[in-house]
Amino acid sequence: MPKYYCEYCDKYLTHDSPSVRKSHTIGKVHQQAVTLYYKQFEAEWFKSQMQQKGGQVPMMPPFGMQPGLLPPNMVPGQFNIPMMPPGQFPFPPPPGQPMGGMPPHQQQPMSFNPHHPYPPPHLQQSAQQFNSNSPPSNNDQ
């Protein structure tokens, strides 16, 4: 069975299964090895910046910020406008609509359409009574 090699820790894991790799990458020894690995490149970058600037200390980004990254509530191309939560719109809903979005689907009440050739079954009797009470037309004579 092939073994998994961790380049940060410079060691082989006993098994090549996702659970073993996950538990290794969560571990304290691996986290420290990754931190040391990237600190090495940070020191090299600092030295190269010192040489390019002629001895001046380069500007470091504020604590917690990485160059080129936006804060988590910012969208590229917007000016200090926080992102909206999912499912919400940046404008208010039309009058009569709730704030949460579209209302649930509601069925329209059934009504009798006098122009429809056949009324619903529960209204057939009332339609027959309506027709019997109406005055006779010229075609009936």
From Swiss-Prot:
This protein's superkingdom? Eukaryota
The segments labelled Disordered in the record are 69-141
State where composition is biased (Low complexity).
100-110, 124-141
Q: GO molecular-function annotation terms?
A: mRNA binding; pre-mRNA 5'-splice site binding; U1 snRNA binding; zinc ion binding
* Record-level GO cellular component terms: commitment complex; U1 snRNP; U2-type prespliceosome
Q: Name one GO biological process term.
A: spliceosomal snRNP assembly
Q: Which InterPro entries match?
A: Matrin/U1-C_Znf_C2H2, Matrin/U1-like-C_Znf_C2H2, U1-CZ_Znf_C2H2, U1_snRNP-C, Znf_C2H2_sf
Bias kind Pro residues: ranges? 83-97
SUPFAM superfamilies in the record, alphabetically?
A: beta-beta-alpha zinc fingers (SSF57667)
Job of this protein: Component of the spliceosomal U1 snRNP, which is essential for recognition of the pre-mRNA 5' splice-site and the subsequent assembly of the spliceosome. SNRPC/U1-C is directly involved in initial 5' splice-site recognition for both constitutive and regulated alternative splicing. The interaction with the 5' splice-site seems to precede base-pairing between the pre-mRNA and the U1 snRNA. Stimulates commitment or early (E) complex formation by stabilizing the base pairing of the 5' end of the U1 snRNA and the 5' splice-site region.
**Membership in a protein family:** Belongs to the U1 small nuclear ribonucleoprotein C family.
- The protein in question is named U1 small nuclear ribonucleoprotein C
Which classification does the entry list for the species?
Eukaryota, Amoebozoa, Evosea, Eumycetozoa, Dictyostelia
Q: Encoded by which gene?
A: snrpC
